[in-house]
A protein has these predicted regions:
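Accessory cap/linker subdomain of secreted extracellular hydrolases
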Residues: 214-319
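Short alpha-helix in the alpha/beta-hydrolase fold that links the catalytic acid
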Residues: 194, 324-326, 338-349
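Gly/Ser-rich "nucleophile elbow"/oxyanion-hole loop immediately N-terminal to the catalytic nucleophile
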Residues: 86-93, 162-182, 201-206
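C-terminal catalytic histidine-bearing segment of alpha/beta-hydrolase fold enzymes
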Residues: 304, 308-310, 336, 343-344, ...
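Short, surface-exposed "cap/lid" segments of acyl-processing enzymes
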Residues: 72-81, 85-125, 140
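Alpha/beta-hydrolase active-site loop
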Residues: 147-169
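Catalytic-loop region of hydrolases
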Residues: 19-91
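Short beta-strand/loop motif that positions the catalytic acidic residue
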Residues: 322, 327-334
Length: 413
């Protein structure tokens, strides 16, 4: 590993000291990936019936593919990657957003712009720079993804922020000091994870202006764990979670030994070749626990010292006191992430003394996918209020909120 990093460092001029020093966070390389014009984005918005009055399309955007050094869970350096969205033609300092994407099981990157890319563009065309980390083990990075583990997710984002400082110098970009964190689904969880990691370990390096977690599974050991015992639309979440948890917490010597046949061979094959989430779901039982041997299910149910409980508790994000404002958005009919995750997180953060944590209902009738549209819009309004001078955040422009309300009436579940 270190030999390969050394060769990369030699080839790219990266300071070799940074690879062995946990405090050294360095960009390895970047290249222009795509450019998007105002006209292209406006056309896309109109084709999807998004009111252009909701988003100011003011700038063309360059998107850079960035490779940088991050860290594995044991602190050793690993390669990581991400995309950096930069508005063109701005010389004034700009606010910065870290957008955390939802669950992915495949490495690499689609060559076309997908749904979450347009959420990033929604910020960038209005004058925000946007980082979208691939997370450890995804994109073009090394190792495998430690799904729903807050320290790994947060570390990938923090290291990307350090790398972006260097890239800003190369591109002549200035930051205005405002840092916003957001994301959806696993990304909603990851945005709050990054907030926690910065507050715990990097408060001298970064100051979070505000975070907006959208449809995140924050209550890992509580509300979200209940899906294991009932019919669930995305059963692949369980083996994905167990794969990463076993790497860090050593729950069992061989994680594949806990599965009933034929899942004991199908699961490592599907995850090993980076199958699409839908393909994995099709070979798994509707009730997630049915893929696991009953002896392990009973250990989980009856033994509070079973290591899985510690793994879930360590990675629940409901029991800490954020120092900066946070908005938690949810939708009542979300079939993948129980909306009560946001309720529980909000209640416990307030109990611990957090003063500026708010709830936002993205829609009582929407499921997981349509909730992403409205939670993204509410996040933009929330972040804009800080850019416009609010200290603790507001709901946003009244006219735009009215347009959103009309859209919610028009768009079916």
């Amino acid at each position: 590993m270190k030999k390969m990093l050394f060769l990369l460092a030699f080839a790219t001029g990266l300071n070799v000291f940074a690879l062995d020093n946990p405090s050294g966070h360095k960009m390895i390389s970047y290249k222009l990936w795509k450019s998007v014009t105002k006209e292209e984005l406006t056309k896309k918005m109109k084709s999807n019936k998004v009111p252009t009055a909701l988003i100011k399309v003011r700038y063309d955007v360059d998107i850079y593919d960035v490779t940088y050094v991050s860290h594995w869970h044991d602190g050793t350096p690993v390669l990581a990657s991400g995309l950096y969205y930069v508005p063109k033609g701005i010389t004034a300092p700009m606010p910065q957003v870290v957008y955390h994407h939802g669950t992915r099981t495949r490495k690499g990157r689609e060559e076309h712009l997908g749904g979450e890319s347009y959420l990033c563009l929604g910020f960038a065309v209005d004058g925000y720079t946007v980082l979208m980390p691939d997370y450890i083990g995804l994109g073009y990075g090394e190792k495998f993804h430690l799904y729903q583990q807050y320290k790994s997710l947060g570390q990938a984002s923090v290291d990307f922020l350090f790398a972006a400082r260097e890239l800003n110098d190369s591109l002549g970009i200035k930051a205005n000091g405002q840092l916003f964190l957001t994301g959806y689904s696993e990304g909603g969880y990851a945005s709050i994870a990054t907030n926690k990691v910065i507050q715990e370990s990097y408060s001298n390096d970064f100051k979070v202006t505000a975070a907006a977690g959208n449809s995140g599974a924050y209550d890992m050991g509580g509300v979200q764990s209940e899906v294991m015992f009932k019919k669930y639309s995305n059963p692949h979440y369980l083996p994905y979670l167990l794969l990463g948890f076993n790497e860090v917490y050593k729950i069992v010597p061989d994680i594949n030994a806990i599965y009933n046949p034929p899942y004991d061979s199908l699961i490592p094959e599907m995850f090993g070749k980076g199958s699409h989430m839908g393909d994995i779901d099709r070979i798994l039982p509707e009730v997630p626990k049915d893929m696991v041997k009953d002896t392990f299910v009973q250990l989980y149910v009856n033994d509070p010292k079973f290591p899985m409980h510690k793994a879930l508790a360590d990675n629940s994000l409901c029991y800490w006191k954020p120092e900066n404002p946070i908005q938690l958005c949810y939708c009542n009919k979300d079939e993948q992430v129980n909306y009560k995750n946001a309720i529980v997180a909000h209640e416990n953060m307030k109990k611990l003394g957090a003063k500026h944590v708010t709830l936002r209902n993205g829609g009582r009738k929407y499921g997981h996918y349509k909730c992403a549209i409205f939670s993204g819009m509410y996040t933009k309004l929330y972040f804009d209020s800080f850019r416009n001078g609010s200290k603790y955040g507001r709901k946003g422009n009244l006219n735009k909120r009215f347009l959103l309300a009309l859209a919610k009436l028009a768009i079916k579940p």
